[in-house]
């Protein structure tokens, strides 16, 4: 089981591709390694199914907790449903792979990437993407690769290739670029308001490294004596397509030129043309080749009709510069937006509409305990900003069962989440956990960017002090030979019939997120740069329209949102606040009707709908953690009496004891002869023993309050409004 290993080095990091050693019954397999991260990627092909008109490609990313030396925490101690990160990585594999398979291919294909070992310095996702290409080539599957992917980070002014997790967190850019010999085929990035020029430079920098990984794959194939299988389309009967071109081109073209019609009207007219054509074909002679072709496959007419519509729409854009709704290539659809559209029971809400795409976003403010723990191979910090995206069937006028979120919903939600994170306020000044939910009410293209815009409106309506508002736009592309047209703000039909879906989100100062997917085998960086630069005026225009609805975050929170106080205590005193078995902190929460969270670093966050109650809880905690010294004098209240003395609360939550011998200069027979529960007394700290117990005295202490010591009022870190 020796196998063959090819190594390539980037910035001191070595990537190793081992073939011929693992998973011998898979169509093709490769072990991708970098540092201590190991990902096994397999590609398998099986006989296609009858009657389908799409590529049945499945891409899975599997995490095994043993890869990080951990045992699952579930009852069965076994991995269960893939975590969100695994779903996103599976999409990251699928998106650059899918356009490289022949459009006519109908065989079942499955790519499985399994993370077997994880080095905390080396993310596994880009290794899985590159491995998918290598495994597919080794499996002899028709494929227009090789394809490879790398990650680019930005530390200071320097780009870093395949940065570690820590470098990603410290840097201003997290960009993944995938490409083929033909150009870039996929880009995904989160950025800290970077200028367009920096992002374009990063894509170019990454593509150079991609080319090196492509050469490594080609070298492995050559050394193994494997010839890459070139896609060869099956012979197709062109009689039906010729018939449709002759009989339908004029009527379809006329519909596409009716720029004032609605989407529903256009779809209805195209359906009518198709139905009339079907009737005409059905009236042909029984032995007519066109009729026999349609009768043999119920989907062949629909597929050929769509292909002709696509061809005519693309020709109209290339030759006339006209889109189906009459817009110019760089024109944005009509924008309307509103903030505060729901009652304030909902902490914040925003409604964003662009053309026929409409998104309702809501923002909810929560406490630190609402943060999401990341139960995956690289847990990292808890998530304190969550974005959830819902795409119900009625948004496209369809009916289907309502199910749990699929990969698409998870991916769109993650992109919108990524776009907003760079502008969120620092945790120490705004310690709320934030959840935004975007409900797609109507869809006609670019709902993910609509969700970004809706999120901004909802968060500002909720009173979240964003560093800057964020907007987003989706760019498209039509490529016919050397002719290229870039489209601004694509709608559904342009996404479906076009060659690119490029989403760009950001503020007026720069980009915060982008995602590019292709339907062709690659684009030069120069063309991508044109799309990025063309997106900027569209983003700014959309942002200006949004700011007409709300130009700054609200100055006050919803009356139904929790109020938070945040302050710091000595981490060594956390146990004092919590108490044995959590008794002390539970008593404080019950007494003040608040919710209290304490982080390991000593940051205490108190949540309550009543600001006064939160302040009371803060005073108790500060009293518990305040250091007192021998000789200090306090006014306190007798809280309980025992035979040998009395306990006095000298600070909120902090008690000391007066021994019976310290109650008076004279001999005392019974404690309650001198003091009773509820009495106000002035005491001096006589001693603090080695167990931290405070011993008090009344002897020699005047009871007129002159030597009492008052405590300053606490100053909250987070506002109470």
UniProtKB/Swiss-Prot annotation:
Enzyme class: transferase
Keyword hit for Hydrolase: no
EC identifiers of the protein: 2.7.7.8
Residues bound to Mg(2+): 495, 501
Keywords: Cytoplasm, Magnesium, Metal-binding, Nucleotidyltransferase, RNA-binding, Transferase
Domain KH: from-to ranges: 562-621
Subcellular location: Cytoplasm
Location (main, coarse): cytoplasm
A biological process from GO: mRNA catabolic process
Reaction catalysed by this enzyme: RNA(n+1) + phosphate = RNA(n) + a ribonucleoside 5'-diphosphate
Cofactor: Mg(2+)
Pfam families registered for this protein in UniProt: KH_1 (PF00013), PNPase (PF03726), RNase_PH (PF01138), RNase_PH_C (PF03725), S1 (PF00575)
Region (Disordered): 700-721
InterPro entries: ExoRNase_PH_dom1, ExoRNase_PH_dom2, ExoRNase_PH_dom2_sf, KH_dom, KH_dom_type_1, KH_dom_type_1_sf, NA-bd_OB-fold, PNPase
GO CC annotation: cytosol
Cross-referenced CDD domains: KH-I_PNPase (cd02393), RNase_PH_PNPase_1 (cd11363), RNase_PH_PNPase_2 (cd11364)
GO MF, one annotated term: 3'-5'-RNA exonuclease activity
Record-annotated S1 motif domain positions: 631-699
UniProt record similarity statement: Belongs to the polyribonucleotide nucleotidyltransferase family.
The protein's role, per its UniProt record: Involved in mRNA degradation. Catalyzes the phosphorolysis of single-stranded polyribonucleotides processively in the 3'- to 5'-direction.
Protein name, UniProt field: Polyribonucleotide nucleotidyltransferase
Organism whose genome encodes this protein: Prochlorococcus marinus (strain MIT 9303)
Gene that specifies this protein: pnp
């Amino acid at each position: 089981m020796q196998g063959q290993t090819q190594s390539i080095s980037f910035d001191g990091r070595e990537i190793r591709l081992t073939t011929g050693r693992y998973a011998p019954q898979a169509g093709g397999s490769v072990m991708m390694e970098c540092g201590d991260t190991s990902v096994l990627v397999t590609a398998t092909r099986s006989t296609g199914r009858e009657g389908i008109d799409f590529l049945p490609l499945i891409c899975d990313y599997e995490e095994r907790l043993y890869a990080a030396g951990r045992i699952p925490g579930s009852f069965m101690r076994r991995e269960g449903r893939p975590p969100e990160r695994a779903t996103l990585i599976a999409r990251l594999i699928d998106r650059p792979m899918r356009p490289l398979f022949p459009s006519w291919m109908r065989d079942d294909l499955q790519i499985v990437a399994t993370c077997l070992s994880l080095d905390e310095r080396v993310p596994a996702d880009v290794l899985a993407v590159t491995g998918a290409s290598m495994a597919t080539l080794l499996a002899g599957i028709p494929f227009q690769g090789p394809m490879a992917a790398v990650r680019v980070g930005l530390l200071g002014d320097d780009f870093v290739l395949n940065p570690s997790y820590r470098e990603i967190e410290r840097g201003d850019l997290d960009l993944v670029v995938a490409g083929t010999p033909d150009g870039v085929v996929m880009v995904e990035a989160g950025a800290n308001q970077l200028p367009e020029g920096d992002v374009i430079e990063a894509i170019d920098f990454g593509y150079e490294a991609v080319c090196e990984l492509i050469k490594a794959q080609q070298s492995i194939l050559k050394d193994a004596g494997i010839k890459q299988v070139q896609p060869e389309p099956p012979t197709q009967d062109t009689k039906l397509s010729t018939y449709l071109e002759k009989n339908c081109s004029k009527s379809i073209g006329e519909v596409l030129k009716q720029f004032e019609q609605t989407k529903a009207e256009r779809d209805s007219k195209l359906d009518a043309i198709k139905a009339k054509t079907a009737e005409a074909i059905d009236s042909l002679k029984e032995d007519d080749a066109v009729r026999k072709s349609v009768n043999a496959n119920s989907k062949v007419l629909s597929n050929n009709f769509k292909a002709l519509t696509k061809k005519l729409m693309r020709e109209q854009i290339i030759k006339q510069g006209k889109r189906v709704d009459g817009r110019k290539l760089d024109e944005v659809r009509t924008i309307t937006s509103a903030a505060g559209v729901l009652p304030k029971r909902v902490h914040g809400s925003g409604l964003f509409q662009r053309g026929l795409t409409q998104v309702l976003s809501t923002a909810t403010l929560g406490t630190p305990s609402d943060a999401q723990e990341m139960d995956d191979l690289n847990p990292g910090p808890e998530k304190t900003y969550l974005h959830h995206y819902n795409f119900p069937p009625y948004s496209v006028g369809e009916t289907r069962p309502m199910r749990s979120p699929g990969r698409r919903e998870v991916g769109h939600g993650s992109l919108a989440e990524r776009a907003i994170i760079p502008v969120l306020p620092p945790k120490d000044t705004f310690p709320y956990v934030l959840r935004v939910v975007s409900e797609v009410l109507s869809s006609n293209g670019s709902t993910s960017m609509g969700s970004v815009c809706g999120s901004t409106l909802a968060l500002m309506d909720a009173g979240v002090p964003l560093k800057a508002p964020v907007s987003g736009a989706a760019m498209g592309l039509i490529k016919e030979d050397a002719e290229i047209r870039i489209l601004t703000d694509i709608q559904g039909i342009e996404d479906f019939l076009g060659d690119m879906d490029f989403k760009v989100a950001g503020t007026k100062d720069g980009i915060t997120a982008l995602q590019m997917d292709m339907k062709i085998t690659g684009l030069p960086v120069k063309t991508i740069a044109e799309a990025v630069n063309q997106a900027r005026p569209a983003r700014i225009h959309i942002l200006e329209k949004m700011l007409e609805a709300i130009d700054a975050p609200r100055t006050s929170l919803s009356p139904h949102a929790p109020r938070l106080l945040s302050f710091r205590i000595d981490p060594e005193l956390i146990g004092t606040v919590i108490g044995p078995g959590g008794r002390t902190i539970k008593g404080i929460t019950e007494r003040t009707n608040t919710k209290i969270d304490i982080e390991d670093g000593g940051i205490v966050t108190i949540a309550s709908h009543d600001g006064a109650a939160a302040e009371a809880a803060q005073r108790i905690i500060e009293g518990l953690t305040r250091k007192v010294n021998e000789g200090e004098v306090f006014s306190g209240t007798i809280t309980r009496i025992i035979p040998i003395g009395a306990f006095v609360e000298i600070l909120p939550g902090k008690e000391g004891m007066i021994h019976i011998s310290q109650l008076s200069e004279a001999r005392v027979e019974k404690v309650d002869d001198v003091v009773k529960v509820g009495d106000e007394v002035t005491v001096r700290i006589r001693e603090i023993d080695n167990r931290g117990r405070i011993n008090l005295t009344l002897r020699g202490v005047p009871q007129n309050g002159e030597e009492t010591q008052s405590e300053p009022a606490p100053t909250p870190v987070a506002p109470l409004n």
